[in-house]
Amino acid sequence: MSDFVLTCESAADRTREFFAARNIPVVCFHYEIDDVVYTDDLYQSITPDKFFAQIAAGAMPKTSQVSVGEYEEFWEPFVAEGKDVLHLTLSSGISGTYGSACVAAQMLADRYPQGGKVRVIDSLWASSGFGLLLEYAADVRDSGASLDETAAWIEEHKLNLHHWFFSTDLSSYLRGGRISAASAIIGTALKICPLMTVDCDGKLAPREKIRTKKRAISEMAKTMMAHVQGGTDYSGKCIMSHSACREDVEAVAALIEEQVPQLKGKIEINDIGTLIGSHTGPGTVALFFMGDKRVD
């Protein structure tokens, strides 16, 4: 096995068990509700249903990124003992955490000139798409690849990962400035579920306005067929995540599993975590898979 440490952040929205099994240490973001600060701890201290119920009832969570000091504290034990670290961050298109991570990595390099080095990669991803990229990275690492080889694989393939999502509740997107008040009012009145993606710069980008949830479910499956490697013969991994809308995500998963029978296992469904969920609110369904390279 390669002799370096692969690390990430809690915004990757995979389970605690996944990170433990794949030997990927995780540093956590934070969120705040009613002046109380909580840790985005992979739902160890709150359930997804309770968290999204708070938002549905009017709670307005605020989020904060991992600080430079927290990164230093997280990596220092590895660096001090001479272990190199490869760290993937949440997309720089939606968070400033990449910059903080780079600052912390340089500070540790200055403090431990003979110690391990930290290499930081901007994933350009979020939620379980970020988590899927980590899974592929762990596979490459476990094949015996060096840190540089693993980093090169990530950089070469990260834009082949697709991230598509829709939401039936636009209130959190309005509050976060991702859509205008007029769009939110019209969208709610017309039952529009916007189909969105993460673009090649790692930013949220609207792609299509779809009337009704039923059509959005169907269009999400069609979108995968338009971009996935090999079409119906795709044999790679597909992951989905959702924010308190299990029935909707299972409906999309059922369509995809019917249309792509060669999938690597059944579609894994995860809960959107508290960090990302603070911005989506309830009602978001997200889909992640390997496809053609994103160019816009």
Model regions and ranges:
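A short glycine/small-residue-enriched secondary-structure motif
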Residues: 45-52, 75, 80, 107
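N-terminal glycine-rich anion-binding loop in soluble enzyme alpha/beta folds
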Residues: 5-70
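A short, structure-level motif marking secondary-structure boundaries and short turns
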Residues: 1, 36-37, 59-60, 122, ...
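Glycine-rich phosphate- or other oxyanion-binding loops that anchor nucleotides, phosphorylated ligands
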Residues: 56-92, 99-103, 147, 151
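Positions that flank functional sites
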Residues: 34, 93, 202
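Mixed-charge interfacial surface used for oligomerization/domain docking
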Residues: 3-5, 11-30, 97, 101-106, ...
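Short beta-strand->loop
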Residues: 89-91, 121-124
